[in-house]
């Protein structure tokens, strides 16, 4: 077991990225356009270009006069991110992008194509302060929070890439990249509102197709429920007992398993949405039959039918001595959880060979 890192809830104070059109709510966009001396309909045009046509470069917004393009480009569409590197695997069906921000901060997103859907896994922070010892992101520490626009640019880029390369459409968004989304709460919630708002106010993606993941910040889970966004909540539990979880998921020293599950139940009750429980299966660490039994009992008692367990075969990370559980152990774990009346499946792992799978993102390069 590596030496534990400290938990970091508050990101280091760094200069904010320049204000971008995507940072602004509808009323703020209207005010920003008015401040430029432009008529209100220009704001709607800009929103349609960004969220509808997926254009972030004003020089390509051909329904605007050249002078207006220059004006809004300088004031509302600064260059935020550079795609510093893109790599593929899974026969081109998985693509990881290394993003470099204007302050040289780096983070990653992953686009995954499936026969029935296209999913982008996006980051909410550069790095992560939750210090989970089996996760490369957590072991790298927290650099800073991402702005709302930096989060949304990952979505816009993936949507445009799918459309332009193959005429496809982005169908699912998961906040499972770098960072703890609920530790960057306000910007993540603002991003979700833009993602789910209908065009031209947002990207028009169904809330049911958006997943927000957390290691278990119980008060923030309850707060998210009160937002009534109706996105899917995913809780990275990884073990049902406090003794092991205190080490595997250090935030458990602040909010214990039962408190996290109670918050998840509150979320399920308010939204009517089934909660996803993420469980990275680690050989001889958290894969024992009794832990499968305890997991099934606790989830059935707390969440009833409003829960599903996603088992994740542990993905390798640099310097780690841990590895995934053998397939027979994995199958027995699934059987035991299901025997307690809880839905349980094994996640299809993508991107392992390019360090794009769950727990592997480290923004190196």
Swiss-Prot record:
Cofactor binding note: Binds 1 [4Fe-4S] cluster. The cluster is coordinated with 3 cysteines and an exchangeable S-adenosyl-L-methionine.
First-listed, main subcellular location of the protein, grouped into a coarse class: cytoplasm
Binding positions for [4Fe-4S] cluster per the UniProt entry: 128, 132, 135
Alphabetized PROSITE patterns for the sequence: RADICAL_SAM
Residues at the catalytic site: 108, 358
Residues binding S-adenosyl-L-methionine, per UniProt: 179-180, 213, 236-238, 315
InterPro entries, per database record: Aldolase_TIM (IPR013785), Elp3/MiaA/NifB-like_rSAM (IPR006638), Methyltransferase_A (IPR040072), RNA_MTrfase_RlmN (IPR027492), rRNA_lsu_MTrfase_RlmN/Cfr (IPR004383), rSAM (IPR007197)
Subcellular location(s) per record: Cytoplasm
GO CC terms, sorted: cytoplasm
UniProt GO molecular function: 4 iron, 4 sulfur cluster binding; metal ion binding; rRNA (adenine(2503)-C2-)-methyltransferase activity; rRNA binding; tRNA (adenine(37)-C2)-methyltransferase activity; tRNA binding
Keywords: 4Fe-4S, Cytoplasm, Disulfide bond, Iron, Iron-sulfur, Metal-binding, Methyltransferase, rRNA processing, S-adenosyl-L-methionine, Transferase, tRNA processing
Signal peptide feature range: none
Anything else known: Reaction proceeds by a ping-pong mechanism involving intermediate methylation of a conserved cysteine residue.
HAMAP family referenced in this protein's UniProt entry, alphabetically: RNA_methyltr_RlmN
Primary role: Specifically methylates position 2 of adenine 2503 in 23S rRNA and position 2 of adenine 37 in tRNAs.
Name of protein: Probable dual-specificity RNA methyltransferase RlmN
Protein's organism: Mycolicibacterium gilvum (strain PYR-GCK) (Mycobacterium gilvum (strain PYR-GCK))
Primary gene name: rlmN
């Amino acid at each position: 077991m590596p030496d534990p890192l400290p938990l970091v809830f508050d990101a280091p104070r760094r200069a904010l990225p320049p204000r971008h059109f995507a940072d602004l709510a509808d009323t703020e966009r209207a005010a920003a356009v008015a401040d430029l001396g432009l008529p209100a309909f220009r704001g709607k045009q800009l929103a349609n270009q960004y969220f509808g046509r997926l254009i972030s470069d004003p020089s390509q917004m051909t329904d605007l006069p050249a002078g207006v393009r220059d004006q809004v480009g300088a004031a509302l569409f600064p260059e935020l991110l550079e795609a510093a590197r893109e790599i593929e695997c899974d026969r081109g069906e998985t693509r990881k992008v290394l993003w470099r921000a204007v302050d040289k901060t780096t983070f990653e997103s992953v686009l995954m194509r499936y026969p029935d859907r296209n999913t982008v896994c996006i980051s909410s922070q550069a790095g992560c302060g939750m210090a989970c010892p089996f996760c490369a992101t957590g072991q790298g520490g927290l650099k800073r929070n991402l702005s709302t626009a930096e989060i949304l640019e990952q979505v816009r880029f993936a949507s445009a890439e799918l459309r332009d390369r193959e005429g496809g459409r982005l169908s699912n968004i998961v906040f499972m990249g770098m960072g703890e989304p609920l530790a960057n709460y306000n910007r993540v919630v603002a991003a979700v509102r833009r993602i789910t708002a209908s065009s031209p106010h947002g990207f028009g993606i169904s809330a049911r197709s958006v997943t927000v993941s957390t290691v278990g910040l119980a008060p923030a889970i309850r707060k998210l429920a009160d937002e009534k966004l109706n996105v899917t909540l995913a809780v990275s539990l990884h073990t049902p007992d406090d003794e092991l979880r205190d080490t595997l998921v250090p935030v458990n020293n602040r909010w214990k398993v039962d408190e996290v599950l109670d918050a998840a139940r509150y979320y399920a009750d308010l939204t009517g949405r089934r909660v996803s429980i993420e469980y990275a299966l680690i050989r001889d660490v958290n894969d024992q039959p009794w832990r499968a039994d305890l997991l099934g009992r606790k989830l059935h008692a707390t969440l009833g039918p409003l829960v599903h367990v996603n088992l994740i075969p542990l993905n390798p990370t640099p310097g780690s001595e841990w590895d995934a559980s053998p397939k027979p152990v994995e199958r027995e774990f699934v059987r035991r959880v299901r025997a307690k009346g809880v839905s349980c499946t094994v996640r299809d792992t993508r991107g392992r060979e390019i360090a794009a799978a769950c727990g592997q993102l480290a923004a190196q390069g």
